[in-house]
């Protein structure tokens, strides 16, 4: 069944809510969980769901994303008609770049027309979750709908800024509304549903919608494309986390809408019973892995104190030499020097924490070198003068920062 489906992964957005982490990369390429990129979760879902024809629509500062796709996801055999292919704006529908999700699909209409697929699965490549798309496609076919969208309970953890869905007891969509600016402050009803950025279209119906559409960015496919056609087309909802197609018991979904959401999603991985279990063996998340030696701890060269880490994730190539790491996520090739202390922080690839430095509640970008004796995360006013500080006090030291 998935062999009859063409998959479009939307990965063109910058994702300004994650600035400054998205100053030099799109949201889909932001590191997550000690070794992954955000897009890996969507692509892993495609892999496990049997989807083998995947187009990744890219645009904003896409080099790092393209490199990651090349290095980590060149796993399909094109001789069998399988592919994961990045598609930057081709300007076939004029001389404009992608104006939004809908415009990105519109500009690649020719790829839909040349495909033999009967369905088009459209996925946002910027959220963290596990999902069996094959079951959604099966439900779509069984219902006879022109479009099926994945929905989740708005009371469930994740995001409060997704469009709201009204559905009847037969899962037929009756309405879609854009979220209000103050939606986070309004407690949702017990049965309130929200979209997830997962849509299965009949290709013929999608092409007819493109024929009728204008030239706007169509920022939300549900509100801008599906809602106007509810009177003439059958749209159904597919409940995420239901018994059908369940691949994980947690119903976890997070769109990383802000620095605080990103930080909490990462820190949640360190719980004894994490809301998202990266160690689930039957639905592993694939990514590119550099050829680095194992992480290790060694005594400090001067103090002789053993390097230690507690309740933390350490990626390959990381060395703690006489320092202390507590409740942290350290990506590859991180160095924590003699006497340095790192608490409740996320350190990207190649970060070096100098001797005697102390970091607390920080996100340190790739290749930043923290000087000896530096203190970050203890004086909010001082931190705001130098770095980005989130509403909840997470300090982000941007890429390329020099002390």
Language model features with spans:
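Unchanged
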Residues: 1-270, 384-399
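Left-handed beta-helix
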Residues: 1-8, 204, 211-403
């Amino acid at each position: 069944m998935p062999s009859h489906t063409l998959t479009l992964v939307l990965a063109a957005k910058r994702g300004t809510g994650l600035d400054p982490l998205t100053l030099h990369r799109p949201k889909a390429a932001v590191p997550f969980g000690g070794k992954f990129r955000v897009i890996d979760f969507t692509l892993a879902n495609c892999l496990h769901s049997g989807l083998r024809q995947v187009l990744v629509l890219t645009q904003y500062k896409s080099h790092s994303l393209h490199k990651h796709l090349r290095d980590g996801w060149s796993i399909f055999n094109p001789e069998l008609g399988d592919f994961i292919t990045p598609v930057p704006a081709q300007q076939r529908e004029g001389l404009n770049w992608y104006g939004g999700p809908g415009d990105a699909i519109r500009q690649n209409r020719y790829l839909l027309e040349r495909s033999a697929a009967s369905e088009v699965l459209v996925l946002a490549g910027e959220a963290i979750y596990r999902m069996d798309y094959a079951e959604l496609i099966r439900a779509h076919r069984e219902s006879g709908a022109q479009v099926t969208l994945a929905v989740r309970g708005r009371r469930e953890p994740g995001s409060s800024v997704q469009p709201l869905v009204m559905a009847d007891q037969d899962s037929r969509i009756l309405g879609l509304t854009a979220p209000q600016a103050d939606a986070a402050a309004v407690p949702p009803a017990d049965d309130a549903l929200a979209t997830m950025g997962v849509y299965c279209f009949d290709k013929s119906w999608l092409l007819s919608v493109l024929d009728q559409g204008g030239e706007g960015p169509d920022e939300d496919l549900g509100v801008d494309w599906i809602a106007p056609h509810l009177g003439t087309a059958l749209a159904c909802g597919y409940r995420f986390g239901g018994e059908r197609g369940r691949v994980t018991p947690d119903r976890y979904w997070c769109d990383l809408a802000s620095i605080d959401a990103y930080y909490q999603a990462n820190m949640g991985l360190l719980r004894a019973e994490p809301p998202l279990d990266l160690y689930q063996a039957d639905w592993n998340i694939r990514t590119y892995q550099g050829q680095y030696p194992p992480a290790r701890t060694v005594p400090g060269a001067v103090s002789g104190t053993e390097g230690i880490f507690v309740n933390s994730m350490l990626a390959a190539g990381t060395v703690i030499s006489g320092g202390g790491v507590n409740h942290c996520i350290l990506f590859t090739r991180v160095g924590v020097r003699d006497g340095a202390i790192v608490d409740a922080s996320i350190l990207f690839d190649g970060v070096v924490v100098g001797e005697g430095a102390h970091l607390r509640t920080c996100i340190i970008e790739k290749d930043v070198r923290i000087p000896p004796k530096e203190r970050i995360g203890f004086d909010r006013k001082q931190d705001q003068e130098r770095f980005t500080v989130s509403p909840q006090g997470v300090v982000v030291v941007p890429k390329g920062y020099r002390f």
